[in-house]
């Protein structure tokens, strides 16, 4: 019962993170229901600026190799179990993404827009465009896996800290968790902004990325992570 109760406490502590994600997901699902794929892509990707081009171009790269370097940081403090948690979450999420990608073989926006010669696909200079396996977005999954892992570990430490927990500390914690969610969501949106993915690709990628850390944490908390106080 202690194990199940602890998981419930962690999820309850991250209720703001989870609820806001579900609200965002519901809004995006509503957009997917209301607009055709190409029309929604143009709607989501209609305002480009030089600053945004540079920001999303480089921020999107974080989900490639930098995220894995950051996940190695706990090794400095000899907390290899935290790196194992990040690694198992990213690997499991990546496996799910690759299985789905190769089941659907969905074309990327640059290929789909060839069928719409009257529409100009928004592109960012210097970004190498990909053409296949669009669904779901692997980068988005990576972003959400990483920041959800951070949120789960932050919640665990919050629950087991010696500092007094009250409404004020909970509000500060919840705001911190929303910053993590915003960083994940920005990563997902960057894939739409760069026209590497459609909104549906990003939506499903976020679902995979949000879910896998919870599953891995549930399965490995006692055996691998050894986070019992």
Q: Where are each of the predicted segments found?
A:
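N-terminal transmembrane-helix/juxtamembrane module of multi-pass inner/ER membrane proteins
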Residues: 2-68, 101-130
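Membrane-interface helix-boundary motifs at transmembrane edges
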Residues: 8-11, 74-87, 158-168
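Interfacial segments of alpha-helical transmembrane regions
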Residues: 16-17, 71-99, 177
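Aromatic-anchored segments of alpha-helical transmembrane domains
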Residues: 26-31, 91-99, 182-195
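Membrane-interfacial segments
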Residues: 39, 80, 87, 103-108, ...
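Hydrophobic alpha-helical transmembrane segments
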Residues: 59-79, 139-149, 154
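Transmembrane alpha-helical segments of multi-pass membrane transport proteins and ion-pumping complexes
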Residues: 94-98, 102, 210-217
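Membrane-embedded catalytic cores of phosphoryl/pyrophosphoryl-handling enzymes
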Residues: 122-229
């Amino acid at each position: 019962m202690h194990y199940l109760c602890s998981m419930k406490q962690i999820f309850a502590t991250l209720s703001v993170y989870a609820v806001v994600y579900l609200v965002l997901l519901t809004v995006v699902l509503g957009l997917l229901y209301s607009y055709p794929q190409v029309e929604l892509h143009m709607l989501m990707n209609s305002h480009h600026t030089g600053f945004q081009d540079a920001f999303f171009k480089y921020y999107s790269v974080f989900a490639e190799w930098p995220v894995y370097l950051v996940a190695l940081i706990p090794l400095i403090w000899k907390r290899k179990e935290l790196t194992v948690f990040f690694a198992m979450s990213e690997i499991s999420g990546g496996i799910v993404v690759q299985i789905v990608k190769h089941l659907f073989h969905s074309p990327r926006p640059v290929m789909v827009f060839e069928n719409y010669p009257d529409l100009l696909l928004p592109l960012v200079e210097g970004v190498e465009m990909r053409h296949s396996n669009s669904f779901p977005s692997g980068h988005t999954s990576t972003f959400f896996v990483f920041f959800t892992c951070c949120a789960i570990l932050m919640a665990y430490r919050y629950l087991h800290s010696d500092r007094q927990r009250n409404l004020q500390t909970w509000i500060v914690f919840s705001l911190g968790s929303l910053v993590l969610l915003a960083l994940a969501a920005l990563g997902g949106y960057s894939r739409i902004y760069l026209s590497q993915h459609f909104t549906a690709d990003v939506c499903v990628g976020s679902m995979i990325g949000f879910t896998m850390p919870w599953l891995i944490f549930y399965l490995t908390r006692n055996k691998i992570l050894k986070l019992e106080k």
